Amino acid sequence: MKHAAWPLAALLALSLLPPHASAQDTPLRFNFASQDKPGMQAVRWRADGGAPLYDAARGYGFVELTNAQPARPVHTATLRQDGKAVLVSEPAFDGDNHYGLAFRIKAAPGAYAIGVRTTAGSEDATVSISGMQTSRLLKASTWDAAGLLPNRTPMRVDGHQWSFRYVNGQPFIDVELEPNRTGTPVGIEEITLTPLPAEDRPAGSLPTVFTLGDSTVKSYTFDEAPMSGWGQVFPRLFDAARVKLVNYSNGGRSFRNAYAEGRFNDLLLAGRRGDIVMIQFGHNDESEDENARWGRGALETTYEHMIRNVYLPAVRARGMVPVLVTPMSRVNGTQKAGVPYENSFRKRHFPDIMRRIGQDSGVPVLDLNARSVEYYNRTGVPAVTAMVMSIEAGETPGKTNDGSYANGHPANKIDGTHFKEAMSKQYARLVAGEIERLAAGGDTTARQLGAMLRTDVRAAIQSGDWSGIYPEIAADIQDGDKAYYRNQFEKLVQLGVIQKDAQGKVDPQASMRTAEFTAALRRLLGLPAGALASYADGELTREAMGAILADAYHARFGTRPKYMTDYNGKTVVPGMPGYDPNLDSGAKGAMYYPLVDWSKLEDTAAVAPAYAARVRDAYQLGLIRSENGIVRGRMVNGTLLEPKTGVTRAKAAKALYFMWVLGQPPQAENHTLTTAAK
């Protein structure tokens, strides 16, 4: 499919991009042997027998502090040359710092193929480039939760030869070598840096907008439902015939560790000239581990250094276009009604730093931080709290890093940092609005981005009426107490199993009819038309709902889905597949199954005999739980089943959403609009 012509402003912006990746045009080759080698720069020891220290005028030499953040001490005084290589041996290590050596090479921003020949293999030595975490780069990995985005630029080791493609943003590159064992000499024989030019986009291919950020931007899977990131739903606002969007975000990431693990590097090597890179970090940068080698946290000076001296120069050197997004304010999970929301960045003022850098460097800044606080105060505490990760028992079979959500949030709090899809769509809308705001002010990059938005999205931004973009947002679930199950209603309306009335409402407090409930359940689980037909229509009661859920479950599932088994009371720990140190909370896994045994419920005798066995089955399967005494933000179960109580449309939506997630592939992205229909 041909895409529409770009506007003149976008073409002019492309014409101003740098002509190639780096001012360094020819390969740099360094020889650490005492004998000269053709075409290589000999690294000679000083007259006093010491190793040559870095000299910017000369363009190379050893350093005592690496360019990592924080800088890592290494050694120069103990380096020696044995005629074949430069060697280092360490009598002791300091935690994860194995010291070793760092050879600095003057190299302009741009991409390089780096080759390092060592005296020892990877069992004895580790090579790293400019503070990157080689242990992460040696493993086959993907950058996203669904496993759709593989790392295409790993560190490769072939015997004693190490190879890595690296995009540099600083005026030099550090080649680091650390011994893996004390008392074991390791060394470097040769280093080669070969410039890699920025690549043009193939003719006829679409431009790409990359999003890079933390858990608030990430694309989530069904096993993490209902959590969502704005980068996951952002593509919905764009014209797919004009642009593609790729989300490199993941939880636990900051400017520091997204760089160190190679995420940022791989994005830059995947991109082409003229592609746009939207970057949002700040929440994990608040972590108070700024002195840890592989930490997430940053002081304000480090945060500014990473943006100014690492990220922006590297993006530009690849001919790509940077856009900064200020991190949204965290929501206070205990916010009291009537008290205005305030910006959560009160200790480390990262959004202010990002705004200043944007102004100084001519980089557009989309101020999601400011817009988020405005949105919270317009919307009000009940609806905002409902849209963040406020989870009660029976709301979702998904999990967090601490275990199952099925009995409520395992952290026993309302998590105001993370949020449901109902909120991620609002953040995406606010980001799009910021694009149009900057475009109206004459920013050429914002105009380029704005031209890629859907025409109706641009109209919605101008009018303030988003009902055509998000028709699933019913008129009566947007604020107040009726917004409590807003996320569930939005998804069920999207899926076509709950209908809005002529006034655009879903009437959450009205009674649910049995026929509507069974029809919705059949469609969500892909059951045949005749399934659940034995239930007569009328106002749905909890005991009837329990029996229906049990019948639907057994009609759909031959074996228990992974939500009930793999994620039941388990926490991923080091050594297990999928373990990510950036997401390790140290907590024990929470259970999926009800915390209160069936025998401990106080009113089971009131269940009609015709329903009793199926209701018990549904309860023990975790498909229906007590609604009495449960609280969002706490892992708690009640002791009353209330079998004769009528089911509101809101409570029915809660149960239907739970069953929909239960029927989805755990590792599929959870914004997918799919039922289990076969």
What label would you give each PLM region?
Residues 1-7:
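Bacterial N-terminal signal peptides that target proteins for export
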Residues 7-15:
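Bacterial N-terminal signal peptides
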Residues 17-24:
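Sec-dependent signal peptide cleavage junction
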Residues 24-220:
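Compositionally biased, intrinsically disordered or flexible polar/acidic segments
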Residues 32, 195-249, 264-277:
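Serine-esterase "nucleophile elbow" of acetyl-processing enzymes
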Residues 35, 178, 212-216, 220, ...:
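Active-site-proximal beta-strand/loop segments in catalytic clefts of secreted hydrolases
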Residues 265-421, 425, 429, 433-438:
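Alpha-helical cap/lid subdomain in secreted, periplasmic
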Residues 380, 461-678:
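N-terminal propeptides
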